[in-house]
Structure formats: structure tokens, C-alpha cells
Amino acid sequence: MTIMNGQIYEERRHVDSVKDCNFYHTTDIPGVGLVEGQWDLRDGVDEYLGSYDFGSKRVLEIGPATGFLTFYMEKTASEVVAVELPMDRSFWNSVPYEKLGLARRNNDQWTDVEVQFFDHIGRIRNGFWLCHEKFSSRAKVYNGSSENLPDALGKFDVALLSAVLLHTRSPVSIMESCARLVSGTIIITEMFYPELGEDAVCSLVPAAGNDAWDTWWRFTPRFFTQFLEVLGFSEHQVTFHQQRAFNHTHDMFTIVSSRP
């Protein structure tokens, strides 16, 4: 948990230029203009968020990237708190590929993969803080493990986990951690793979024949709804939609699960 001088949230940072940034989301930034990112959610953001009404809600967001959804929700929400991993590789969820040098101890020399990832994520964080300033955002950022969220963050009406659980070693631990702090609703958006069927499936992506070091899982919607019911979120709305990323259209699903 990151607490300095009694302060649980990261201090705001000034970023001089878009040249210091990478952008995960295509965003029209006030005073800057349109910047292109890997994902363009502008035409489908309501579907992506399950058409949920964030009005006057306190929102917990896991993994904001460059903040497109953060600042969109903030238009109507009472507060948005985003959770990011510290820039410390002991927190990272890299798949431990032996052939990529990732199956190692924390004190080993950094691999080329890690160095490139560290630089990319640092520039993504710069993109978030540049947008934060340009949008005059009040959103707060907590740096720590989403598998062990502290009570000091307080209670939330809703949590958003969008296209993040596929990158995590233990998605159920993160869902459980969020559920402890959420009184109302959990929203999960992920890629849709109809070939996985309709049962509760969490399919492992990494294999010896690929280099998927940053992606662990593919899911069915039922995997999430079944475990969310275990956590007390038994009322579900599941929708399917398409979004643009990496110059392609992708099938996705969004689950809006609420406590009764």
C-alpha cells in the first residue's frame, strides 16, 4: 500500500508535452487536439460501460491507462478513484516465460521486454497526467495492488474493470478485493470469444508456442457472473458490442452486476 505523510493518493504531476506520452485511448484533449491511441472508444463508450448511469456515484476504476474512461465518468460521477500498479516490477503480472528471461528472481537483471514495457507504461502514465491537467480533472490515483485494496480508500457505489482482468495473474482476487469496497455495482468489460461456449470458462492464453507475456486469459461472460454471484452481486445485465482497436473491430461484452 502506498501512503506517504498520511497521503494515500499520488500527487498530481505536470507533463510538458504530448511528445513525452503514449496514448492508450484516442482522445480529443482540450488545448491539444485529437491524439490517436490503440483503442478508439469515442463512438461506443456508452455500450462499453454497459449504459450505466454514473450520476452522483463514487467510482473505483481499476487500470485507467490514459484516462479516457476516467474523465468520461467524471462528467457525472461524484468522484473517481483510479488504481494503478506501482512502477515496480515486483507488482507486475508478466507471464514467466523462460525463453524471454521472465522466469527469474526480482533481483535479476532487467530483460529487454521489461525495459521496453517500463518505458511504455511510464509514457502511458504521462499521458494520463497530461490529460488530467487539460481536462481540469479531480480524479484521484492510488498506486498499489488491486488484489489487496486498503480500507482507507473508503466505500464506492460502483467499480469498473475494463479490459484489465485478462492481463492479471489472479482475476478472482481482484474481483474479491473490489467487492469488499463496493456497495452497489461491478462493471466488467472484456473481449468476447464465442468459441469458448456459454459455461464459466477462464481459458489460459500463454503457451510454449507463443510469446503472450502480457496476456493471461480469455473469458466467457458466465465466468464473471458466476463468481460475482458468490461475492453477492446477483443481478446481471450482459450486453454485447463491437469496439475499434489496433485498426480492427473487436467483439466485446460488458457485464453490469449489482447487489440485490
What role is predicted for each listed range?
Residues 157-170:
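A short SAM/SAH-binding and catalytic strip from SAM-dependent methyltransferases
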Residues 172-185, 192-194:
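A short glycine-rich, Lys/Arg-flanked "PGG" loop and its adjoining helix->strand segment in the class I
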Residues 57-65, 187-211:
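Conserved class I S-adenosyl-L-methionine
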Residues 136-147:
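Conserved SAM-binding strand-loop segment of SAM-dependent methyltransferases
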Residues 124-131, 214-232:
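Short alpha-helix
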Residues 35-57:
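Conserved alpha-helix/loop element of class I SAM-dependent methyltransferases that forms part
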Residues 66-77:
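Conserved SAM-binding loop of SAM-dependent methyltransferases across substrates and taxa
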